[in-house]
Amino acid sequence: MKTFSAKAHEVTREWYVIDATDKVLGRVASEVARRLRGKHKPEFTPHVDTGDFIIVINASKLKVTGNKTLDKKYYRHSGYPGGIYETTFGKMQERFPGRALEKAVKGMLPKGPLGYAMIKKLKVYAEATHPHSAQQPKALEI
């Protein structure tokens, strides 16, 4: 029996919606990354994007455990000498709700063209409304 390998044009993608209210950031991010990659499907193939579309609502209500609201830091650099910027999780959630989740999921996906295609299937919204009702997403409980 030959090993099955999925073809990109044969992959069927579902739409799922996750309510992130009072959920822990890392637990949501790891499940989202798993489903974006397609590892929950029996036809998973490492070199083919077999993942589903994921909509995360209420991203502004994500939680972290312990003191990470103040202690977890995100860094970025302008490219100039001494141009490093640092932001805490609390400030990031206040200013850009959902960006912390996007960064967490992006770090869990492969680096390269396949990973970039996977992250495009993630839709994050700070509030409970989203414009994807036409796709009839199924509720996914984490």
Curated annotation (Swiss-Prot):
PANTHER family (alphabetical): LARGE RIBOSOMAL SUBUNIT PROTEIN UL13M, RIBOSOMAL PROTEIN L13
Oligomer status and interactors: Part of the 50S ribosomal subunit.
Keywords: Ribonucleoprotein, Ribosomal protein
GO cellular component terms listed in the entry, alphabetical order: cytosolic large ribosomal subunit
UniProt KW 4Fe-4S keyword: no
GO molecular function, one term: mRNA binding
GO terms, biological process: negative regulation of translation; translation
Protein name as catalogued: Large ribosomal subunit protein uL13
SUPFAM superfamilies according to UniProt: Ribosomal protein L13
Gene3D superfamilies referenced in this protein's UniProt entry, alphabetically: Ribosomal protein L13
Assigned protein family: Belongs to the universal ribosomal protein uL13 family.
Superkingdom classification of source: Bacteria
Residues spanning the membrane: none
Task of the protein: This protein is one of the early assembly proteins of the 50S ribosomal subunit, although it is not seen to bind rRNA by itself. It is important during the early stages of 50S assembly.
Pfam families, sorted: Ribosomal_L13
